[in-house]
Structures are given as C-alpha cells and as structure tokens.
Amino acid sequence: MPDFSKFLFFDLEYNPETQKVREYGFILGEEYVRDRNPAKLESAASKAKFIVGHNVLRHDAPILRQYFSIKFPNVKALDTLMLSSLLFPRKPYHKLRKEYLHNEDDPSDPLEDARLCKKLLEDCIEKWGSYPWQLQYLLFQFLKNEPGFSPFFELVDVPNTLKLRLKIAEIQRWFTSNYEKAICLRQDFQNEWK
C-alpha cells in the first residue's frame, strides 16, 4: 500500500438549493477534520500531493474551484467513483456504502465519507494487483492520460511498457480469448500500439 500521508481524502456536503457548502470532512495523514471553515481545507490541500474523493471530478471539483482556493493543476485528483466502476464492474452500484446512516434521510457525515473513500481506494489498489498483467497493460494504455485515472497508475505496479511491446501478440491472444464474445475484435492491435 502506498504511503497515504500526502493524500487528502475528503468529502463535501453541498446544498444545491442554497448553493452553499454545509460542511466538509477530510483526512490528511493523521489529521481528521470535520468543519465549515474554508481555510482549513485550503491549507490541507496545499500540503497534499493527491486529492481523493468519490465523484471528485464531476461534483466536487467545480465546488472546490468556486468556494475554495484549490486549483487542481497543483494536485493530482483521484476519483474513487471512476476507479470503483472500472475495477469492480460487477457491482450493481458504485455509491459509497454509508452503513453509519440509520435512516436514508439522515444527513451524511463528510468525515465518515472521507474514511469510506480511503478504504475504497485501498480496495481498488488491492483489486488492481489481482488482475492479470495483460489486463493491467491494456487498462494502463487506455487510461494513462485520463483525468481521475492517471494518478492511480503512480500508486500501483504497472507492467513495463517497453518490455511488453515485444509481447503484443501475446496480449492480443489473451484479449481475444477473454473478450471475443463480448466485443467486436476486428481491430489490428499490432498497428495501433506502435
């Protein structure tokens, strides 16, 4: 597991009717905070190398830009909603499992959600390690430059692309044997990945 001391795991509780952040929760190293004060979150983000949230790119990033002085080019954003969808495709849904709520109408606890987000990232890293190297290679090639995914590849072992280029025929055979009934395979991989 990576050293999470420079990871800011966070969640925002935002009211779209009032267009205000009700509160936020975050974990940065040994610091666990649930607050409303923008300065604390901004300070924590300035110390972080990674910002990790569940649906961070579509939901939280616009709010962070609007209400806080947090600029994403300065940190790497990991989106556990996107990672969960990719790495656990058989799950019927990818919402955080908020078992701490006694009633569906209870307000979410952003600090508890930050803890859940951290656990989910740990699960994603573990799941990645269980994938065959061929699938790791394909996912890396397709997603290495995609927001929300690209920072993930700094946390996990990725097959050495230089060595694997020599094994492209083996990757093509593996992919065909595992996915030929699921998708159209009339594409020549050899020409695409040179």
Segments predicted by a language model, with ranges:
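DEDD superfamily 3′-5′ metal-dependent exonuclease/proofreading module
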Residues: 1-194
